[in-house]
Amino acid sequence: MMNMKIVLFSLLLFVIRWNIISCNKNDKNQGVDMNVLNNYENLFKFVKCEYCNEHTYVKGKKAPSDPQCADIKEECKELLKEKQYTDSVTYLMDGFKSANNSANNGKKNNAEEMKNLVNFLQSHKKLIKALKKNIESIQNKKHLIYKNKSYNPLLLSCVKKMNMLKENVDYIQKNQNLFKELMNQKATYSFVNTKKKIISLKSQGHKKETSQNQNENNDNQKYQEVNDEDDVNDEEDTNDDEDTNDEEDTNDDEDTNDDEDTNDEEDTNDEEDHENNNATAYELGIVPVNDVLNVNMKNMITGNNFMDVVKNTLAQSGGLGSNDLINFLNQGKEIGENLLNITKMNLGDKNNLESFPLDELNMLKDNLINYEFILDNLKTSVLNKLKDLLLRLLYKAYVSYKKRKAQEKGLPEPTVTNEEYVEELKKGILDMGIKLLFSKVKSLLKKLKNKIFPKKKEDNQAVDTKSMEEPKVKAQPALRGVEPTEDSNIMNSINNVMDEIDFFEKELIENNNTPNVVPPTQSKKKNKNETVSGMDENFDNHPENYFKEEYYYDENDDMEVKVKKIGVTLKKFEPLKNGNVSETIKLIHLGNKDKKHIEAINNDIQIIKQELQAIYNELMNYTNGNKNIQQIFQQNILENDVLNQETEEEMEKQVEAITKQIEAEVDALAPKNKEEEEKEKEKEEKEKEEKEKEKEEKEKEEKEKEEKEKEEKEEEKKEKEEEQEEEEEEEIVPENLTTEESK
């Protein structure tokens, strides 16, 4: 039930922000009764019916799939038939246009006047941007324009825009009192008759021009003016609702980032405006908006920081941005004089363009840049003033609600100080903060379970819920497709935490403190067709609970004593396989002592954080440090207690720094590698030279051997020849001797 309430509440915010319903001007003349806006129950009933309405008036809304819608449709059958419902939804999405406001001769409240002023400033700013772009294009094509000044369409359009800007500046100078009145008006809620002023503001951009293509230019300008107003309305609703609708809105914006089922698609036409707004740190009262959004979990639940903003805003009485307005008017005089010097010509005669001073465009462009900067500051001041007005309107709605409740109960009308009213408002923020905390934890656990245990395609089909609740039969872990026991323990632990949160959430909503409350183990068997209660039905059904009943218990009490005091059977968590989880989550019924309640609730939050920390540690061990799960878990559960996540830009910077370091290291290693390569080459060359020397020595030795062998052979031959000669001589001598003897 609480989940759907939060979704419905966020739907209301989106309905107010987007301004996406287009209706006829004749229908707008009726408006919506202010009683709807000042009555929380009726307003919530409208949102409920619109949430479950199949033929919804909200463009782009998904078809409802909530099981509670069946009962809601039965309640809203008669309401859907009435024309008042369609008109109310239409005007709720059109910026709180009231019936009294539109029926009383065009009277406007202060917030509407401030919105019209912002629309005018936004169109004025867009005209300056268009003129700057036109001047840049002229400067880039100056050599062509010098040749053809008389019939150059770019130069002609520039002169037209300068004349339009001159008329706007003259109008602002003549109506200084109007601007000062809007900026310095106090946040009263009486309607002021400013019909002529608003008409003059809205019609200033539609003045006719005495030139050719007159009708075409007027049509284009009207179309641009309408788009500008739509963009600014979207921008205003976005910024104002996000910053003024107390901590519920802040937490809902955080929930929209957590839940996958919320509408993540923004209007593409508003991207430029949002980028410009994000670049400026708007302030709400005295405290910056960033301080409200970046508070820790404890301050978010107690609402201390936001209450400081409320008190500071209620204490303010003067206007905002008077210095910015003076600077804006003074700079506008200089722009007007500059434009007057440049545009002293009749646009009907194109030959006058020959005298157009192109050299003075640089000075004009510089003045436009300064003027645009001052215009942004003035727009910021107007937005701050508008936020203060809306915050006071929120406070006044709460006061009127308390008075009406007192009249219905027959009690005297409350007459207390503003501080006491703020404390009452703080109780509502405290209650809503706890409910939103439960919703955020549960949605996060669902996402974690889907991340760790993704469903197969076959499992995505519709499955009976009873079959899902039946315990799985544990098979052998070796079988294919069976989850290990560790996975089952983790999933069961997550499911148990979600069941506990569901149960405590229902207790906070219903405030059932009887001893017959169904424990969490049997809560799944309860009747699901319960009607959705209004935001303050607990107050009506059980007023004594809010003022008298208090249920506290001590840590040292036995379990039976705790059950008697709270009326709820506490269920133990199923312990994890490798971790110890604390035994119980405690439920404290909200009584009338704020300090004790805040301390008890903060203790419960710390216990929930410890439980989630244990689950987180177990999941990290199982997933081996999965970074994606770690980021999601840290951002949505641990808030500021866990390490802050690095943004994408920081990651890119780190990656660039790492790549630069790697490149530097590579560059540093490069000369070392070259020296090693040169040394290796020298070694190889030396080895080659040594091998060649060895070869040469071997060849020399072989040659020497061959020569020695040849010499030995020759010597042997010589010796043989000498021996032969000696033998021949010996043979010759005896023959001679014989001859002599014969004689």
Curated annotation (Swiss-Prot):
**Where do transmembrane segments lie in this chain?**
none
Compositional bias of kind Acidic residues = 226-274, 722-733
- Regions of biased composition (Basic and acidic residues) lie at 459-473, 672-721
List every stretch annotated Disordered.
202-282, 459-487, 512-540, 666-743
Q: sequence repeats span which residues?
A: 226-231, 232-237, 238-243, 244-249, 250-255, 256-261, 262-267, 268-273
Q: Write out the PTM section of this UniProt entry.
A: Not glycosylated.
Q: Where is the signal peptide?
A: 1-23
Q: Which GO CC annotations does the UniProt entry carry?
A: membrane; plasma membrane; symbiont-containing vacuole
Q: Where is the composition biased (Low complexity)?
A: 512-521
Superkingdom of the source species: Eukaryota
What sections of the sequence does the record tag as coiled-coil?
A: 644-733
- Main localization of the protein described in the UniProt heading: membrane
Q: Where in the cell is it found?
A: Cell membrane; Parasitophorous vacuole lumen; Secreted
Polar residues composition bias: which ranges? 211-224
Q: How does it sit in the membrane?
A: Peripheral membrane protein
This protein's UniProt keywords: Cell membrane, Coiled coil, Malaria, Membrane, Repeat, Secreted, Signal
Q: Where is this region: Interaction with MSP1 and host SLC4A1/Band 3?
A: 77-235, 364-528
Task: Report the family membership.
Answer: Belongs to the plasmodium ABRA family.
Q: What does this protein do?
A: During the asexual blood stage, involved in the sialic acid-independent (SAID) merozoite invasion of host erythrocytes by binding to host SLC4A1/Band 3 protein on the surface of the host erythrocyte.
Q: Give the PANTHER family listed for this entry.
A: VACUOLAR PROTEIN SORTING-ASSOCIATED PROTEIN 72 HOMOLOG, YL-1 PROTEIN TRANSCRIPTION FACTOR-LIKE 1
Quaternary structure, per UniProt, is: Forms a complex composed of MSP1, MSP6, MSP7, MSP9 and MSP3; within the complex, MSP6 and MSP9 mediate the binding to the host erythrocyte. Interacts with MSP1 subunits p19 and p42; the interaction is direct. Interacts with host SLC4A1/Band 3 protein (via the 5ABC region). MSP1 subunits p19 or p42, and MSP9 form a co-ligand complex that interacts with host SLC4A1/Band 3 protein.
Q: What is this protein called?
A: Merozoite surface protein 9
Supply the gene name.
Answer: MSP9
